Amino acid sequence: MSKETYLHLVTLLKPAIHQRNTKFRECVSAEERILITLRYLGSGCTFVSLGLYFARGDNTICKVIAEMTVIIWEILNGDYMPLPDVQHWKDIAARFDRLWNLPNCLGACDGKHIRIEKLPDSGSSNFNYKSYHSIVLMACCDSDRLLFTVIETGYAGRNSDGGIFSASRIKRWIEHGRLNIPLPSKLPNDQSNYEFPY
């Protein structure tokens, strides 16, 4: 990441970070909080190694990352991952049809295991078939640029992609019409008058 990009992130996120120094301790600055979080998200380092690198306690690192990921999502979500509108979905479907001959396809969905340290008192709930502890990121992306259109994360690694999708908000959003999905339409080169859902 360039210095300019980092400074731009600081400018965007700093107003939402509310920390004060006290008589007993100096708070972790907004700049350092952002650095800790970026290092964690970019490398997957353990809290212990981040604590050593930044000379902070493991619990402090854990708390900073938990707070900062929420702030990053709340501040940047609307600009960098807005909910697609009907026309955006139709553009994605047109690219799927043109590139892959898949008409009315709005995305490719899959789960990705994100390696984590074993959580305290979690037993084997995050232990996956690849023989490590993980949480699962369920995501849908467009046809060619591999840009996420919908994401959800936090499911225990032992769950299958199908099980996660069945229990996910993504599935509920689709079923309840909250994703601005276009109305059914005819398939290209189809002689019937049937309309098929996206």
PLM segments and residue spans:
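Short alpha-helical segments in extracytoplasmic peptidoglycan/chitin-binding modules
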Residues: 2, 36, 50
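Short, well-ordered secondary-structure "scaffold" segments embedded in the functional core
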Residues: 46-198
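Short, amphipathic alpha-helical "recognition" segments used to contact nucleic acids or chromatin
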Residues: 30-43
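A structural signal for short hydrophobic/aromatic patches embedded in well-ordered alpha helices
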Residues: 8-9, 36, 92
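Basic, low-complexity segments
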Residues: 1-27
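Surface-exposed beta-strand-to-loop junctions
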Residues: 14-17, 42-51
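Structural motif
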Residues: 25-31, 127
